[in-house]
């Protein structure tokens, strides 16, 4: 018997034929919330990205559902409490996008510190802005990494290649684990006070909602730079906007927003903000890894085999 798996947001091409032979994949990319409620009942598992919401209402009608797979890291679009109540296993693919998000973070950092987007737009407008665009170096700057999981650690390693000093705050990882990478473990408050650049790599959960708020910004160095390619909601966007307007924050580079897309929100429109449309995992390699990893993990869960990335 083949496991019947619903794909709500597509899946990268899988080359493992044995894995494919064990499942029946039904691709319903772009399925609406209403259609999902109507169609999910026959499926043993569903694989989603960030767009599709797996709510208590969905789980209530999904009588055959055994597993929810999240292609990527964040599971804030899945009601984990409801999944546990319904006896549905939730798994993700947390390492598949690590390299891509880490590389984007460094790209945003370099773009911000050297004013690369402004230089490019100036050239396209026929303006030679050489004298106006005086940046600074990453060399010997203090990078504060909030969240030292797979991505945070990968960012730290790449930053060290630029001879940056890396300090890190993570409430879960031990000081020895952080030190082993070459970073200095510090408290959240100390990180805010010492960092020249702050980059965030944490999930958006109750305890991290608006972690960077007015109080946090008040503790930071003047002219600090903020990078976030994690999840919208971990930064209070109004507080960041106020800090940019006051000059406390010299610039920010954001790949994620509280509301996506952010529309005409003034934050991504600010002249000292570089914005990208949540493209951290949008590379060919990351999507291939994520597709294989999540399908393998979902099938393992259905077969009741040991799991690498079980959430609930």
Model-identified regions with their sequence ranges:
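Phosphate-binding beta-alpha-beta segment of Rossmann-like dinucleotide-binding domains, i.e.
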Residues: 86-88, 94-142, 150, 154-157, ...
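Rossmann-like dinucleotide/phosphate-binding beta-alpha-beta segment
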Residues: 21, 131-222
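An N-terminal-biased, well-structured beta-alpha scaffold segment characteristic
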Residues: 1-91, 213-215, 219
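Short, polar loop motifs at secondary-structure junctions
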Residues: 9-14, 170-175, 259
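Rossmann-like dinucleotide-binding domain for NAD(H)/NADP(H)
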Residues: 90-91, 223-312
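Short beta->alpha connector loops at strand-helix junctions that form conserved
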Residues: 28-29, 49, 71-72, 88-99, ...
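Short, conserved active-site loop motifs that form the nucleotide-linked donor/cofactor pocket
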Residues: 23, 88, 183, 272-274
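Short glycine-/small-residue-rich Rossmann-like dinucleotide-binding loops
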Residues: 51, 73, 196, 201-204, ...
């Amino acid at each position: 018997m083949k496991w019947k798996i619903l794909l709500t947001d597509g899946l990268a091409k899988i080359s493992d034929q044995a894995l494919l032979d064990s499942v029946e994949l039904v691709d319903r990319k772009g399925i609406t919330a209403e259609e999902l409620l109507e169609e999910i009942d026959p499926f043993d598992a569903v694989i989603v990205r960030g767009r599709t919401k797996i709510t208590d209402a969905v789980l209530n009608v999904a009588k055959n559902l055994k597993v929810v797979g999240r292609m990527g890291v964040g599971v804030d679009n899945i009601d984990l409490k409801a999944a546990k109540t319904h006896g549905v296993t939730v798994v993700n693919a947390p390492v598949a996008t690590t390299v891509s998000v880490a590389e984007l973070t460094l790209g945003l950092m370099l773009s911000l510190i050297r004013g690369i987007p402004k230089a490019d737009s100036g050239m396209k407008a026929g303006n030679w802005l050489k004298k106006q665009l005086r940046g600074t170096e990453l060399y010997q700057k203090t990078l504060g990494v909030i969240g030292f999981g797979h991505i945070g650690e990968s960012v730290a390693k790449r930053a060290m290649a630029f001879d940056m000093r890396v300090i890190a705050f993570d409430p879960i990882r031990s000081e020895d684990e952080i030190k082993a990478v070459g970073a200095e473990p510090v408290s959240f408050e100390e990180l805010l006070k010492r960092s020249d650049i702050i980059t965030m790599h944490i999930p958006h959960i109750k305890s991290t909602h608006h972690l960077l708020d007015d109080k946090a910004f008040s503790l930071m160095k003047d002219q600090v730079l903020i990078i976030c390619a994690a999840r919208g909601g971990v930064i209070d966007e109004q507080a960041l906007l106020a800090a940019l307007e006051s000059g406390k924050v010299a610039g920010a580079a954001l790949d994620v927003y509280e509301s996506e897309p952010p529309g005409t929100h003034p934050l991504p429109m600010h002249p000292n903000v570089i914005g990208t449309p949540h493209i951290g995992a949008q590379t060919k390699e990351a999507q291939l890894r994520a597709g294989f990893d999540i399908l393998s993990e979902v099938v393992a869960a259905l077969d009741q085999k040991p799991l690498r990335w079980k959430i609930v």
